[in-house]
Each structure stands twice: as structure tokens, then as C-alpha cells.
Swiss-Prot record:
Uracil binds at residues 200, 205-207. Pathway: Pyrimidine metabolism; UMP biosynthesis via salvage pathway; UMP from uracil: step 1/1. SUPFAM superfamilies: PRTase-like (SSF53271). HAMAP family: Upp_B. Keywords: Allosteric enzyme, Glycosyltransferase, GTP-binding, Magnesium, Nucleotide-binding, Transferase. 5-phospho-alpha-D-ribose 1-diphosphate binds at residues 85, 110, 135-143, 206. Catalyzes the conversion of uracil and 5-phospho-alpha-D-ribose 1-diphosphate (PRPP) to UMP and diphosphate. It comes from Paraburkholderia phymatum (strain DSM 17167 / CIP 108236 / LMG 21445 / STM815) (Burkholderia phymatum). GO terms for molecular function: GTP binding; magnesium ion binding; uracil phosphoribosyltransferase activity. It holds the Pfam family UPRTase. It catalyses: UMP + diphosphate = 5-phospho-alpha-D-ribose 1-diphosphate + uracil. This is Uracil phosphoribosyltransferase.
């Protein structure tokens, strides 16, 4: 895991397996089926990294031989909240890693000015919960910021929110950091820039279209 000195709340997950799978996802010739499988696999690997610092406690366990105080995750419960629609493709990998997690959904699309328009919010109970928001891309950053706003308006502290994405543009990361410096952003790659259509360069195209086999 590395950091960029410009963005103190950005963490780049540079594990070789993550980078290998991301390269295949970038390839325009990768099929919808393979793209979907890779998204699940890479999200599982990234989920392993971002849950590294979960608080721990111990629980008395009887092994076949002795009783021990065994380490278990403490207190707070986990919730996975994909940002629709492309974020749905990431929830499977996270649920494979954390099958007991609750799942919410935040529906946001970008209007012609690339601003977020909210159309759905469904969340589990918020008390004593750690939230993992997920969306494959942080381009302008506005959708990510809006999704975090949804949780914070309901009383969730920034320290209890993480945002997981595959690729991000520096412009979007700056918007994210300015709005929510207390929320950690985890990505597989910090890409070069946004083009005139607000697409990440080099990016991986429209993640939702590639995931579901649709055309924009």
C-alpha cells in the first residue's frame, strides 16, 4: 500500500495481483463475463487490504485440545454500500470476504454537467456500524462526495466510512479530499487525468457498461 504526497487520505493498493487483474480490466477486448469476474476478484483482494485495521478483541474458544482467548473482530458491525449502478459489481467480492455484512444501496447518476443526481437511498441501521462505500471509478469525485454526504447527514462519522474504487483521477481525488478529509479513499490506481468528457485517462472505459454489457 502506497500514498501520494498530494492526497493524505488516498491509499493506493499496489499488490501485484491487484495490479495484474486491473490491467486485464483495462483491456478493451476483455469480455463482459471476464470483466465481471475480474471485478469480483479484485474487490475481494482490495477488501482484504482495507479491513486490515479493524478493531480486535478476544473471545473464549474451546479447541479440541484446550480453551483459548481467540482474536475476533470487535464491536462495530460492517455494512457494504455500493453506489449504483457499477458499484453493485463490487459488492459480491466484498460479501464473499465479509458474508455477515449488511448491504445498502445509494443510487446516483451524473447529469449533463457531471453533477450527481440522487434517485435511491436504502441503508441498514446505522448504529455502531463501519461503512464501506464502493464504486469502480472516482472521476470528477462528485458522486463519491454525494454518497458520503448521504451517510454523514444521517449521523455516520467520517472515521467510520471508507470508500473503495478501482481507479481515480487526481481532479476527483482533490474534490473528494476537500469535501471529506476524514474519509479514507482506497484505489488500485491513481490515473493521469480527466479528458474533456470527464472520463478517466487511461481508465477502463465506462465501468457500468462494461459490467452489464450495455452501451452508453
Amino acid at each position: 500500500m502506497t500514498q501520494d504526497s498530494r492526497f493524505p487520505n488516498l491509499f493506493i493498493l499496489d499488490h501485484p495481483l491487484i495490479q495484474h487483474k486491473l490491467s486485464h480490466m483495462r483491456d478493451r477486448d476483455t469480455s463482459t463475463r471476464t470483466f465481471r469476474e475480474l471485478l469480483r476478484e479484485i474487490t475481494l483482494l482490495m477488501g482484504y487490504e482495507i479491513t486490515r485495521n479493524l478493531p480486535m478483541t478476544t473471545r473464549r474458544v474451546s479447541t479440541p485440545l484446550v480453551d483459548i482467548d481467540a482474536p475476533v473482530i470487535a464491536g462495530k458491525k460492517l455494512a457494504i454500500v455500493p453506489v449504483l449502478r457499477a458499484g453493485v459489481g463490487m459488492s459480491d467480492g466484498l460479501l464473499e470476504l465479509i458474508p455477515s455484512a449488511r448491504v445498502g444501496h445509494i443510487g446516483v447518476y451524473r447529469d449533463d454537467d457531471h453533477r450527481p443526481v440522487e434517485y435511491l437511498v436504502r441503508l441498514p441501521d446505522l448504529e455502531d456500524r463501519i461503512f464501506i462505500l464502493c464504486d469502480p471509478m472516482v472521476a470528477t469525485g462528485y458522486s463519491a462526495v454525494h454518497a458520503i454526504d448521504v451517510l454523514k447527514r444521517r449521523g455516520v462519522a467520517g472515521e467510520n466510512i471508507s470508500f473503495l474504487a478501482l481507479v481515480a483521477a487526481p481532479e476527483g481525488v482533490q474534490v473528494f479530499q476537500d469535501a471529506h478529509p476524514d474519509v479514507k479513499l482506497y484505489v488500485a490506481s491513481l490515473d493521469s487525468h480527466l479528458n474533456e468528457h470527464a472520463y478517466i485517462i487511461p481508465g477502463l472505459g465506462d465501468a457500468g457498461d462494461r459490467l452489464f454489457g450495455t452501451k452508453n
